[in-house]
Structures are given as C-alpha cells and as structure tokens.
Amino acid sequence: MSAVVTLKKGEGRTIKAGGAWVFNNEIETITGRFHNGDIVLVHDFDGYPMGKGFINTNSKIRIRMLTRHVDQEIDRTFLQMRVKNAWEYRKTTVDTSSCRVIFGEADFLPGLVVDKYEDVLVVECLALGMEQFKETIVSLLKEELAKDGIKVRGVYERSDANERTKEGLPKVKGFIGEEFDTNVEIKENGVRYLVDVVNGQKTGFFLDQKYNRLAMQRICKGKKVLDCFTHMGTFALNAGIAGAADVTGLDISEYAVQQANENARRNGLEDTVHFRCANVLDELPKLAQSGEQYDVVILDPPAFTKSRQATKNAIKGYREINIKGLKLVKDGGYLATCSCSHFMTQELLAKTVKEAAKATHKRLRQVEFRTQAPDHPILWAADESYYLKFFIFQVVDEK
C-alpha cells in the first residue's frame, strides 16, 4: 500500500490548479513506509485526495505529481498514453525532424527531457522517481515514432546536469542500448548544423530558439550583424542564410567556435559569416571604442541566474550586457535580446532593457516579443516551464 502524504493547512493550491511540485515545507505528515523514488498518495489537510506522485526526501521538491487520479495505475499503459500525447502534440505544432519530444512537467512526465535530432534521441533525467521509468519511456517513444515510419538509430543519455545532485543522483552520460555515431546533421530553418550530442551543451543543441532564429532572418537580410554568445553559430547562420551582408559571431568557448565554423562551411557561408573566440563582456567595449557599428546586434547570453536569490545580481548582468550591446547598434538598427532564466520574468527583463536604453540615450521601438518554441510548451499551472523571453527592438537615437 502506498504511503500517504498530507499537506499543511492552506497548502495545495498549486497542485489543485494543475501544478506538479510539492515542496518540503508544504508537508504536514507522511503516513506509511516508503523508499525515495516510490509512488505516494497526496492528500490535502482535510484528507481530500489530490493525486499521485513520486517522493524524494533528498530534494526540496519533495513530490513530483504524475496524475490527479488516485486510482490511476502508474504502469506501461499510463506511460504509453503520456508518450503518445506528447508526440501527437509535436506533430500538430512544430517541425518534428528535430524537436523536444518530452518536456518534463509540461508533458506530465516530471523530471524527464527527450530531444529528437533526426533519427537520434537524447535523454536527460533530472528526478530520482523518473529513473525507474526512463528506459520504458524510451522504448515506448521508439514504438510511437515507428508508427510514423521513423526508425531511431540510437539513444544517448545526457543526465549530467548539476540539478541531479539536488536529487541525490550521480551524473550519468552514455549510450542507452547499442553504441552509434553521435555526430548528427540536422536542418532547421534551412540551415544545416552538426550536432554533437556527447560534448555539446545540454543535450547538444538549443531547440527552444528555433522560431526566434527564423524571426531574425527577415530583419538580418542585407545587414551587418553581430551575434553575441553565438555557441554553435545558430543566430549568425540564420542571418547568413537570409542574405546578411556581413556577420560576426562571438563566443568564449573555443570548441563552440570550432563547431560554428564547421556549420558555416556546411552551409557555404564561410565568406559571409565569421566566428571569433572572445569574452563578450570584454569584447563589446573594444568594438565600441574602435568605432564599430552594426545594423543588428543579437544578445543570447547564458542564464545569469538559476535561483530567486541570485536575481538581483542577474539584473545587473543583463543591464550591463544590454548597455554594451546598445552602444553598437546604428541609429535605426535592431537589437534582439533575451533571457533563458525562469526567474528573470518578462516584466523584469523589459524593465532592465528599458534602463539600459535610458543609460545609452536610446529609444526602443518594440518589433515583437517571443518566447520558447511550442515543443517546449508552457504549462500555465507550472511557472517553471516558462523560462525563455525574447525581445526584438528597433533602436533609435534620441533626437
């Protein structure tokens, strides 16, 4: 019989609204025996059943909910339903040649990410309770893809994020099943990329910016473009493929720059798109001092904060990078700026960019606001699923 977790009085509103997490400070009592990773029943303070989830006393996220139905068996049939729904959603909303097939809590499979790069799957498991289901879900996903004529060539696990330690889990990296060539060529928005699922960041590629990159193609045509924190050259190459006159990509990682140059070669853009290894925060003032100006500046920095407590310092970081970027935009040019931190809200990022514009005597005209691609769905009951904010502005000098 499953252990029963009873919440404190007044807690459980997030769960009732459809959220997935129960934190350690929300729990009143736990009745019955359990091991970490086990499925438990969750009740509110008055004993009303709220659903089932897996428990982990090593984590502040004590329970991750799997279902609101206490009579629901968490078995292969249940997992098959979740996987099928996730794949059907992607087929409806995005180009599925390369996409995020499972996005954790937003697909009601908390703690699990699966990315598809053509015929390769990359798995990231961030929750102890999901470990027991991981390989079953991979098997079910392969079956689901096969129904659409997609044969999976190989599966690689990239469960090597620091979040694993918060769950009391070791970092894991390696093949699930037979070994295979882990270099995969994908095509997105007309651009070819070599994705290294073993050594690339996260699962090898940032799929969440897919349609934001596409949105920049129109703006970059015929323009001089600076792409900061370029990583594998994604925004820079979208600019190049759209007909930008000259594109420079900057990244601090030598490996990333090597990959970006290889991607430029694959697309025949070596003469137009150039990459340099540089610390962006140091390089932008040097470019400004030398008199460089660009029609388009793209700022896609790593997350400056991964916790609420670090938000204050993150604001300073975003303000600094946007000030430095704005100084390089020609009058009438364009700035694309974003944050991939959940804790940097849309309102907070907008306020920070507005302050940067004021500090540089620039006026901003918003072209559009965008967020993560639909294969990274935002579950309104789970705030943590909304993390990417992407602004495009026209930049006008004060006159």
Report each predicted region and the residues it spans.
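A short, charged
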Residues: T77, M81, N85-Y89, T93, ...
